[in-house]
């Protein structure tokens, strides 16, 4: 099993797909890496030689921010926005969408599950 950037790549998948298991590498980045190293996309991960695995490992770690390094950079960017107090930072702080989507009805993923309104016992009875 190939281990690149702290992630075990699945043996039976194609290399192009296997590389996308690494946080920060998608299909297009995976293809760029494989083109540069002249490795066929359709090669299975378990068919890679040690030299190919080392070449991929070097290309991923040296040229791209992946896994922990990328996660910390993203979280620091969000923290910076929150500290600045700009609109996007405020939206992050309130756990609301920051790209202009409507929140009256949608945005359940960001806002969390619905909280039902509970009536007070004293307010319900009027004489």
UniProtKB/Swiss-Prot annotation:
The ranges of region (Disordered) come to 96-127
Xref: SUPFAM superfamilies: S13-like H2TH domain (SSF46946)
UniProt keywords, alphabetically:
Ribonucleoprotein, Ribosomal protein, RNA-binding, rRNA-binding, tRNA-binding
Domain of life, per UniProt, equals Bacteria
Q: Which GO terms describe its cellular component?
A: cytosol; small ribosomal subunit
| Alphabetical list of InterPro entries matching this protein | Rbsml_uS13_C (IPR027437), Ribosomal_uS13 (IPR001892), Ribosomal_uS13-like_H2TH (IPR010979), Ribosomal_uS13_bac-type (IPR019980), Ribosomal_uS13_CS (IPR018269)
Basic residues composition bias: residue spans = 108-127
What's a single GO MF annotation on this record? Answer: structural constituent of ribosome
Instruction: State whether keyword Phosphoprotein applies.
Output: no
- Could you give the subunit structure recorded for this chain? Part of the 30S ribosomal subunit. Forms a loose heterodimer with protein S19. Forms two bridges to the 50S subunit in the 70S ribosome.
Q: Which family does it belong to?
A: Belongs to the universal ribosomal protein uS13 family.
Q: What does the UniProt record say this protein does?
A: Located at the top of the head of the 30S subunit, it contacts several helices of the 16S rRNA. In the 70S ribosome it contacts the 23S rRNA (bridge B1a) and protein L5 of the 50S subunit (bridge B1b), connecting the 2 subunits; these bridges are implicated in subunit movement. Contacts the tRNAs in the A and P-sites.
Q: What is this protein called?
A: Small ribosomal subunit protein uS13
Q: Which organism is the protein's source?
A: Desulfosudis oleivorans (strain DSM 6200 / JCM 39069 / Hxd3) (Desulfococcus oleovorans)
């Amino acid at each position: 099993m190939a281990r690149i950037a702290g992630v075990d790549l699945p043996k039976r998948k194609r290399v192009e797909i296997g590389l996308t298991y690494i946080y920060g590498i998608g299909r297009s980045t995976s293809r760029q890496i494989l083109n540069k190293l002249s490795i066929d996309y359709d090669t299975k991960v378990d068919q890679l030689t040690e030299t190919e695995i080392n070449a991929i490992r070097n290309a991923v770690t040296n040229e791209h921010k992946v896994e922990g390094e990328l996660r910390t950079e993203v979280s620091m960017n969000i923290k910076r926005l929150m500290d600045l107090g700009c609109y996007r930072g405020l939206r992050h702080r309130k756990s609301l969408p920051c790209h202009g989507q409507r929140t009256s009805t949608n945005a359940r993923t960001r806002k969390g599950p619905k909280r039902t309104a509970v009536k007070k016992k004293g307010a319900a009875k009027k004489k």
